[in-house]
Structures are given as C-alpha cells and as structure tokens.
C-alpha cells in the first residue's frame, strides 16, 4: 500500500499499547492514573482511535492486571513473559492483531500528551519499509514506532535466541530511522516521546494539560 493510501485509510492501521510494566518508580499502576476526566490508558486509547481502526487496538497487559473500562472493540492480550522488554509485548500485540491491518503503531500507556499528528507522520514515513522508528542521536524510540505485522516471525526468532534489544530487530528487517527533530513540525515539544516514569513527571504532565485548557 502506498504512503498516501495508508495515510487516508485508518482501517489498515492498528496500534499496540504496552501497559504491563511494573511502574515501580511511579509507585502505582500508570494505566489507572487519573488524567483529566479519564484514566491514563483510556486517554491513550481514545487518542489512538482518532488515527487507527479502534477494533485493531491491542492493549498488552500483565497477567492478572486489572485494566480500567475500555470500549468493547478494544482487544486485550497478555504479556506471558514479563520482564523481557518491549519485544515480548510487541510479539503479544502482533499475535492478537486482526489480519486486515497493514501497519501498527506501538506505544506505552504513559504518554497522555501524545500528539495524533506525530502518530500519523510515523505511518507516513513507513513507505515500503518494515519499520519506521524515531531516533534521537544514537537512541531509538521503539515505543513510538510503526511496524508491519508480518515481522512477527522475526520478533519471535529474536526472543527465542534471547536477543531482547529492539536494535536487533531494526538490524534484521528494512527499517527507516526518522530524526526526532524532523517530527517537531507535528509535535513541537515532542510530548509523544515523554514517558511518565516518576511522580514528578506525572505532576508536570497534569500542569501541561491544565495549561492547554
């Protein structure tokens, strides 16, 4: 599918939201943190629903994790091997992805200030590649990247070989690296890349939300 066609056809786009992390630095489950009138995971689901097929949004949770109420079409998968990094969650999400989806945006649940224009731009950058990933110097952002569902087999092979770093995946399949500075036109503060790991990050994000209103 061409870039322009994918841009205009949300039905071919899906999303994976990883929310099974321990949240030890935050001190509580980030998925259920209040953020405005919603909880954190609910907000991220709603924002992504503006850009992708909502029936192709997969929330990847930990075993036994209690999630906030979500729209009935949202899919939930379980990370059966916790503590092995984002590739494990990515594999769980891709396995649960509907067959009609051609590209998937992967994110964590703790990015409530996500800019949907950033997400759209990452889909546009994918082109004929298997992955489009933002890069900041030498650092890749695997949880703000777009993946073709067909890479699942490669992800599973890497996991079986205990190659858990996303960089191994980027080296294995055709990947386009997108300089984060070029994405500021869509997200001037790059808030889509701002994870809330500590209570002070959460408080700062709440202040930013209030300033937007």
Name each region found by the language model:
Residues 6-163, 171-190, 203-212:
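Nucleotide and nucleotide-moiety/phosphate-recognizing core
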Residues 3, 198:
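N-terminal donor/sugar-recognition subdomains of glycan-related enzymes
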